Curated annotation (Swiss-Prot):
PROSITE patterns: DHHC (PS50216). The DHHC domain is required for palmitoyltransferase activity. Palmitoyl acyltransferase. The lineage of its organism: Eukaryota, Viridiplantae, Streptophyta, Embryophyta, Tracheophyta. Belongs to the DHHC palmitoyltransferase family. It comes from the Eukaryota. Residues 111-161 form the DHHC domain. This is Probable protein S-acyltransferase 12. Its EC number is 2.3.1.225.
């Protein structure tokens, strides 16, 4: 029985996950901005509190814009597949047999995909959901209906980063309402439905904060060692992973060298032209830079 044929169903699930992301954003927006801080701001009868409301609303919208920008860039960016010119240059895999590899100079050790029946560059893996080989594949993410690979890994990390900050902000500003829900004040509340929506938003954001914290820590560790989620199982206890070039170079392979672009879900033209790893075909190893 081929279980991989059911993987295509994950794509259908992914479209519902996009709607779920939009729904959570909508609930959070209503709870934080519409119900809580916007009324305080427009009343303007509390100097310090109004200033705090303005600050919270500004930060909330800034993080929301960066979150959605990073998210949809990740969704709509091709993670990278083996280009046709690469297959032609490498002979289409005719010289390779299934399960073998060979050294091809600048491209390092090439592999062979038994499903695509073609040659593949280093760090490239076959995705059973997308039905193709993905360059520097990290994993297939149902939340974005896409693979995370060489060309959208930075955008995915920024999506995690901004989502974590946004949900953390929501948890902090909604905490008083959550506490109020369990106090005697709920019995005297003129709008229990509004209070319930605030509590729902708090619970959802708190759950996301906990899960995202684990995910962010994991990917910081992977980024610092220049490792993907797939490659964690390939390292086989190596003292030093062959693609680990040091934390600075590892970071630049994903985020580029232009600091002004590090927190934006896009690359500078110089980085695209000069960093081969962003194309997902060539990756220097530690033996290339060690004296």
């Amino acid at each position: 029985m081929n279980l991989f044929r059911f993987c295509s169903g994950l794509k259908v699930l992914g479209y519902f996950m996009i709607l779920l992301v939009v729904a959570v954003v909508g609930v959070s927006y209503y709870a934080v901005v519409v119900s809580t801080w916007w009324p305080i701001l427009i009343r303007g009868d509390h100097g310090a509190l109004s200033a705090l409301a303005a600050l919270i609303i500004f930060v909330f919208h800034f993080l929301l814009i960066m979150l959605l920008w990073s998210y949809f860039t990740t969704v709509f960016t091709d993670p990278g597949s083996v280009p046709e010119h690469f297959r032609r240059e490498m002979g289409g895999g005719d010289s390779l047999e299934a399960g073998t590899s060979t050294d091809q100079g600048a491209f390092g050790s090439l592999g062979y995909c038994t499903k695509c029946r073609n040659v593949k560059p280093p760090r490239c893996h076959h995705c059973s959901v997308c039905q193709r080989c993905v360059l520097k594949m990290d994993h297939h993410c149902v939340w974005i209906v896409n693979c995370v690979g060489a060309r959208n890994y930075k955008f995915f990390l920024l999506f995690l980063f901004y989502t974590f900050l946004e949900t953390m902000l929501d948890v902090i500003v909604l905490l008083p309402s959550f506490i109020e829900f369990f106090s005697q004040a709920i019995k005297h509340s003129s709008s229990p439905g509004k209070l319930a929506s605030l509590v729902l938003a708090f619970v959802l954001n708190f759950a996301f904060v906990l899960s995202l914290l684990c995910f962010v820590v994991m990917h910081i560790s992977l980024l610092s060692s220049n490792t993907t989620s797939v490659e964690v199982h390939e390292k086989n206890g190596e003292v030093r992973w062959k693609y680990d070039l040091g934390k600075k170079k590892n970071f630049e392979q994903v985020f580029g060298k232009k600091k002004a672009f590090w927190l934006l879900p896009l690359y500078s033209k110089d980085d695209i032209d000069n960093i081969t790893s962003l194309e997902g075909l060539e990756f220097p190893t530690c033996s290339d830079i060690d004296p």
